Amino acid sequence: MLNKLSLLLKDAGISLTDHQKNQLIAYVNMLHKWNKAYNLTSVRDPNEMLVRHILDSIVVAPYLQGERFIDVGTGPGLPGIPLSIVRPEAHFTLLDSLGKRVRFLRQVQHELKLENIEPVQSRVEEFPSEPPFDGVISRAFASLNDMVSWCHHLPGEQGRFYALKGQMPEDEIALLPEEYQVESVVKLQVPALDGERHLVVIKANKI
């Protein structure tokens, strides 16, 4: 699996240390093991997880601005855990409402010795944001409109929303409230992945 990951990273132009690669593989192995009992993901093959979960998450890392992020609706830690491994200087709050997912995240935190994550069980609407976050990240969480509505209290004045999407979400962008603007849309290149991937970066308009 290490060889496959190394080839995928090379194709993506991403350079990681051996320690980071081993952490990513350990996370995939844990996800595969726990998935049998906890049903954390529909992806069953660890090699497929490398593409659809690991690479699909970490290609976002160069576009994140700031040091303090929250991954809302993180599920089994996607994209938050892979991002925390490749961005060890940043801190990631991993938010999910289901206890079994948060238990898995805490076990990952313990086994991989990840000091820059904080798994939290909470609904996003009820989670306090003190201090506010530099970035609110979501992957397969909600429409853009729902994301900014439910998470409006989380980013700071200069904070951004980072929404990981499949195809270009033109309809969702058109429905964004006028107090928000799309700062950029990045077409992501994920090696060995069928289908499109886009990152939509949103900021609140200054009043």
Swiss-Prot record:
Induction or repression: Induced under stress conditions known to stimulate ppGpp accumulation and down-regulate rRNA synthesis.
UniProt-annotated location(s): Cytoplasm
Function field: Specifically methylates the N7 position of guanine in position 527 of 16S rRNA. Requires the intact 30S subunit for methylation.
Protein name, UniProt field: Ribosomal RNA small subunit methyltransferase G
Organism: Escherichia coli (strain K12)
HAMAP family: 16SrRNA_methyltr_G (MF_00074)
Family to which the UniProt record says this protein belongs: Belongs to the methyltransferase superfamily. RNA methyltransferase RsmG family.
Effect recorded for D71A: Lack of activity. Low-level streptomycin resistance. 10-fold increase in AdoMet affinity
Phenotypic effect of disruption: Low-level streptomycin resistance.
Effect of mutating G73A: Slight decrease in activity. Streptomycin-sensitive. Slight decrease in AdoMet affinity
One Pfam family from the record: GidB
EC number: 2.1.1.170
